[in-house]
A protein has these predicted regions:
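Start-transfer (signal-anchor) and selected internal transmembrane alpha helices
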Residues: 1-31, 223-229, 313-328
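Membrane-interface micro-motifs in multi-pass membrane enzymes
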Residues: 77-82, 101-111, 138-166, 191-195, ...
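Periplasmic/ER-lumenal interhelical loops and adjacent helix-loop junctions
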Residues: 40-41, 235-307
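Membrane-interface helix-loop junctions at the exits of transmembrane helices
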Residues: 22-26, 133-135, 141-151, 235-245, ...
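Membrane-interface coil-to-helix junctions
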Residues: 17-113, 142-143, 152, 267-271
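Signature aromatic-anchored transmembrane alpha helix within multi-pass, membrane-resident enzymes
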Residues: 226-230, 329, 379, 385-413
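Membrane-embedded helix bundles of polyisoprenyl
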Residues: 108, 112-124, 131-172, 178-211, ...
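Perimembrane helix-loop-helix junctions
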Residues: 198-229, 306-316
Length: 629
């Protein structure tokens, strides 16, 4: 029976995948949706990491992309490129040659395993095969699943949660603790995405605690857990997760991506997509969107009914599975975080020590850790459904599935349309449209001299496609200290008038560019490159290209290079203009700006001249000019 359930569930998952996404993503030579983006830009990051790793020389540990975070390299785990899959498929891809993307096949396997383990889990509580397979539709059409697949590709492996729950309940029924299934899941999870680790280990810990206290045996469960930790650490080390010091990534800390208290009945997905035909959109704040956990109308209706039907059994369930309940409570509290939000309001922000905030920020997208509880709530509806007998059970399971799929189908339809569109046109087209970038293909290294560059993911793809290395911090984690040290050394070289002929220097901030460019302006093409719409800018030092003329998107650094206000905003300033008087503007201090202002009597902007009254440089790094306006 288990074999039939798993096979039937897997086929159901494959069917749902094909109906929603078709088969075009299964063409490994079709990477259009990887390059152009799908729903968000993240898949561009995943694919860029794979491209860098594929062209990296063999070494140990595995999965180190030598061209990222150059010169140290970085594990593709931190570009969410599914390191275990990348390691297995790199030899295959290099043998086949040409374009090779695995995002489609990986996601298909995720759907198959979601269906397979979902059917097994349902089969633990529902008799026969028909009712569990009907109930399995809840798992293979899960809104949380569809919110992640192809968008955050590795997080589509939510079968890890279903499989962990299945192995937990199966082991409990057998009175065992040494579940081989849980052991394997805990090891493999680190090779797919680290966020699955606290989920699968929480379920494992619950099993071990319940067994240890019930049987008064600590040694066996303790050794099992130690061996499991060792296996996980070994695979993590093998795949490069412990390589270097990848500790920084983004400004958002624990509490920003918290779960809103309305998450279970809020059908709003990313980009405002509604996963419900009935329920309206609810407000959210901060990064609540990443904690999306809409249950679906079928489950929301069936869940309170199940609670009523099981009211006499719930106490016994909680006593039998006390450790699982405790682990779920901890995961829920962690998901909600210290920033408690409801609809569009922040109810409270509980103070936590900075050390705890830093520790918890390892899993800063805390709302994801609610997934085990999310799927347990679905499972609880099936336990309540099991109170029905015979044909009523099958009818109830079918009705639940029909209502659920009918309700959440708008979200699936939109995701289907988005994939079809992504195959035809770029959802996020490149901003690197200038002919400068064709000339820049000659370099072997792209160095980011400050911050993260505009259109960073297309820049990463550009570097990977042309066999370049880059230090631009586009990955989810990187070594912030090492990057700062490297940038200081490069700036010192430029200050000494030295450029590396094989290196393209990029600045995100004009002020930093103007500070660095003077000593090397005769040895490189220097200037500003923009996108067609002007939303993206790169300030470049391109050795060997001096004297060349590029298109209108390029402004060379020469005597005609224009002054620009500093793009600075705080409580007093608004994009370089002092709010209080609207008469004082600021510029980032540099030799170029001082030279321009030295004997100037007026500033000209948009064809109008404004008399300069005073120039103030008392604030280090800034030149403040008061105009007669």
């Amino acid at each position: 029976r288990n074999g039939r359930l798993f096979l039937g569930g897997a086929l159901l998952g494959v069917l749902v995948f094909v109906l929603v996404f078709g088969v075009s993503t299964l063409d490994v030579t079709n990477d259009a949706f990887c390059r152009g983006g799908y729903i968000e830009k993240d898949i561009q990051q995943h694919y860029a990491g794979w491209l860098f790793y594929r062209q990296s020389s063999a070494g140990w540990p595995l999965c180190i992309a030598r061209g990222i975070n150059y010169p140290d390299g970085l594990s593709v785990a931190y570009t969410d490129s599914i390191p275990l899959v990348a390691a297995l498929l790199k030899p295959v891809a290099n043998l086949v040659g040409g374009t090779f993307q695995y995002m489609g096949w990986f996601t298909l396997v995720c759907f198959a395993l979601q269906g397979g383990f979902g059917a097994l889990l349902a089969g633990l509580f529902l008799p026969g095969c028909a009712a569990p397979l009907a109930a399995d539709l809840l798992f293979v059409t899960s809104p949380v699943l569809f919110e992640r697949v192809f968008r955050h590709t590795s997080l589509g492996a939510q079968f890890f949660v279903l499989a962990a729950l299945y192995f937990y309940f199966a082991a409990r029924r057998k009175g065992q603790y040494a579940s081989r299934g849980l052991f394997v899941l805990n090891v493999l999870a680190v090779g797919i995405h680290p966020y699955f680790l606290p989920m699968t280990y929480a379920i494992t810990l619950a099993l071990l605690l319940e067994y240890a206290l019930h049987n008064r045996q600590l040694a066996g469960p303790g050794l099992y857990l130690a061996a499991n930790f060792s296996g996980t650490a070994l695979l993590g080390w093998t795949l490069g997760l412990l390589y270097g010091s990848a500790s920084s990534g983004g400004q958002a800390l624990y509490g920003y991506f918290c779960m809103n208290l309305n998450a279970l009945w809020n059908p709003v997905g990313v980009n405002g997509v509604l996963y419900s035909r009935v329920l309206p959109a609810q407000n959210q704040v901060y990064g609540n969107y990443d904690a999306f956990a809409y249950l679906g109308l079928g489950v929301l209706i069936a869940l309170p009914i199940a609670v009523v039907l099981l009211r006499r059994q719930l106490g016994g369930m909680l006593r039998r599975h006390w450790a699982l309940a405790c682990c779920c409570a901890v995961l829920t509290v962690f998901a909600i975080s210290n920033v408690i939000t409801a609809n569009g309001a922040t109810l409270a922000t509980l103070p936590l020590p900075a050390s705890l905030i830093k520790l918890f920020s390892i899993f800063r997208s805390s709302g994801r850790l609610f997934w085990p509880i999310y799927y347990l709530l679905m499972l609880l509806t099936l336990v309540g459904l099991a109170r029905l007998k015979g044909r009523w059970l099958l009818a109830g399971a079918a009705l639940l599935a029909v209502v659920q799929v009918w309700d959440v189908s708008p979200g699936m339809v939109q995701r289907s349309a988005a994939m079809q569109q992504a195959m035809q046109t770029d959802a996020f087209p490149t901003e690197m449209e200038s002919d400068f970038w064709q000339a820049a293909q000659q370099y072997t290294a792209v160095v980011s001299m400050d911050e993260i560059q505009d259109d960073a993911l297309h820049l990463a793809l550009f570097a990977a496609d042309n066999g370049m290395t880059t230090n631009d911090p586009f990955a989810a984690r990187y070594d912030e200290t090492a990057l700062a040290t490297q940038r200081e050394a490069l700036l010192a070289e430029l200050a000494a008038g030295t450029v590396r002929e094989d290196t393209l220097y990029l600045f995100a901030e004009e002020g930093a560019f103007l500070q660095a460019v003077e000593p090397v302006k005769d040895n490189a093409w220097c200037g500003r490159v923009t996108s067609t719409d002007g939303t993206c800018s790169w300030y470049v030092i391109a050795p060997g290209l001096q004297g060349q003329n590029f298109d209108a998107l390029c402004t060379p650094y020469d005597e005609n290079y224009p002054l620009r206000l500093a793009d600075y905003t705080d409580a007093l300033w608004n994009r370089g203009v002092l709010d209080e008087t609207k008469q004082t503007v600021c510029f980032a201090d540099s030799p170029f700006v001082r030279r321009k202002l030295e004997h100037a009597s007026v500033l000209c902007a948009d064809g109008k001249e404004y008399t300069i009254k005073t120039i103030d440089d008392h604030d280090a790094g800034w030149l403040m000019v008061t105009l007669d306006i």
